[in-house]
Amino acid sequence: MDRIATWDDYRRRVEDLQRELLTLPAGAPIRLRKGQETSNLFRPRRCEHTAFDADGFTGTLSIDRTQRHADVLGMTTYEDLVAATLPFGLAPLVVPQLKTITLGGAVTGLGIESASFRNGCPHESVLEMDILTGDGRVLTAAPNNEYRDLFFGFPNSYGTLGYALRLRIELEPVAPYVHLRHLRFGSVSECAVAIEAICNQREWDGERVDFIDGTWFSASECYLTVGAYADTAPTVSNYTGQQIYYRSIRSRTDDWLTTHDYFWRWDTDWFWCSRAFGAQNAVIRRMWPARYRRSDVYWKLIALERRYGIKRWIDRRRGEPDREEVIQDVEVPVDRLADFIDFLDRRTGIQPVWMCPLKQRDPAATWDLYPLDPATLYVNVGFWSTAALPAGEQDGYHNRAIEEKVAQLGGRKSLYSTAFYPEDEFWATYGGPTYELLKKAYDGEERLLDLYAKTVQRR
């Protein structure tokens, strides 16, 4: 499918897509067909649905430098979106960590990054969306129009109410460089106190803070990385070659990156997960072409392992215990961060762990399917690994315990990966009554899966 380049192209493609939907069997469940290179979901799923093609909805239709907003198509990756906006000295308010996350995916499935302590999640800087609903309409949803219920109910719906074809998003001015400071703390408790102070004051040691995230390596080694835009840099590091970004956190106190490289600092090694493929071995790394050191390549390797189970077969031959994938992002209140990481460490032994503060941008907004307390500073905790299963236990042993702990601490869990909630608890957590009303209004014949079927039952 050719990329859409103009508004006229976009309107024609919308009409084509609506006609395509009319040709699909009546009553048959439908699903968006998209390439693996733009999928960042970590839940295996059974394919039982008729797919329709929206791959052509990629590209940036317009950038308004005066009003600082852009009209962007829903299947556009953040890699392409940033490439379009940076030449104008502008960027989305939140740029998720991985290049192939799409704008539409980040809005319907949530996203986060180190600007989230001041800008919230990507959906909070959306001005309006054209949404293809399950009943075949294309509706422009905005916070103050007749489809405001769809606008505020769309985040965390994961394509079960419809698909965003076009989004108008806010942009903010950026500088050419980012100055990083890596701050070490001896415990998560100390780190949590610093997170709260930095996010409230938006500075550290007299310097402005535009970005903040953290890396927990062990019970006695925890870092916060604070970043500030800079017009100049005395030197610039490059972590797309032999050097590995997350290792630099432990060895450097100051660093400078171009803004482009800062946005993608985690992508080259998929945070630290490239080690599972040998990409952090110096010899292998030299032979591994730089263009293939990126998150979507590692994702494809994961998909191959899931399909053929080679590593699991080898582990069993060696007599090693079965392991459960524990790939999750959760939000917990900052004052419960130490409790959660202590639990996670004792339960799974997963190290390192990523930490990213988050606060709702507009305290007056209500995002129905993923409600957060607007007065609370949360910390997103990201952990992407495996944990040994006790003899006789099945998948879900660790992940279900994590879900229960997050609920106990007053947090929330993102649904991009596996979930094991009982149905009643799920709907109580993720806006069940509101979701039911939205489903009736915009997908009355249930052509799209419901949220529980898609995220927990993996259909």
Which residues does each predicted region cover?
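Noncatalytic alpha-helical scaffold of FAD-dependent oxidoreductases
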Residues: 1-459
